[in-house]
Amino acid sequence: MSSEVTALPEAAIECRNAAKAFQLYLRRNDQLAQALFGWWKQFYKEHWVLQDITFQVKRGECIGIVGRNGAGKTTLLQILCGITQPTRGTVSVNGRLAPILALGSAFDGSLTGRENAMIGGAILGLKRKEIEARLPSIVEFAEIGMFFDQPMKLYSSGMVARLAFAICAHVDADILIVDEALSVGDEFFAAKCQKFIDDFAKTGTIIVVSHGLDSLAHMCSRVMWIDEGRVREFGEPKTVIEHYRATVNAADAAEEEAA
């Protein structure tokens, strides 16, 4: 009998030549025409939001992603989380991934917070008994009290975000995907979220998108700058952020002069 233990891949995430295009239909009936006659003619234009994205994230790394609005950051996160698939290229995720805040978009407003927590935990890979055992800790972390057993259509956006964060914080994830998660509540709750992320970063893998450049420079081992759907720079945090900040400032100054 072999006593070998299969080692986990060194890379937590590997992205090779990933690209994403969306179909743009310019006329009202083009989508129907595509469904009926797409074999004969293309009735849409391709809008490429990501092009040739290649990178590797090692286990235990904290990677920051920066870029202006519309650069493709959210689409990249959606691909990593499995919400959408790349049009071409490959993405490999090795380990249990918890997409903080993205989970909130999957909640059913007609169900209670408790019911959505059960479903969310199952989506993230927990068994029913495991989820049930963690519900008290989840509701305590989320700080939503009696609303936990109320339909989520009664929740504010902040309460939805709190519950999503709380669920992701209790699923024993290997990888966290964080998209501006620290803007989900008051300073006390934001501090609680930051502490969880700091503790997780000691052993886990994190990808975080944030406009808080100083925070990224402090917590990340590397930073990726996405510009117009492509990786413009990926490396030492302070260097990448300095280049990104200079470019943004120059662009803003040019816009002010033109106004």
Where are these regions (language model features)?
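Pre-NBD coupling/linker segments of ABC/ABC-like ATPases
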Residues: 1-51, 237-259
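Conserved ABC ATPase "signature" region
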Residues: 33-37, 98, 118, 130-147, ...
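The feature captures the beta-strand-to-loop junction immediately N-terminal to the Walker
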Residues: 66-68
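Helical segment within the ABC ATPase nucleotide-binding domain
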Residues: 190-202
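Conserved H-loop
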Residues: 212-218
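Conserved catalytic segment of ABC-fold P-loop ATPases
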Residues: 218-225
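Conserved ABC ATPase "signature" C-loop
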Residues: 228-229, 244
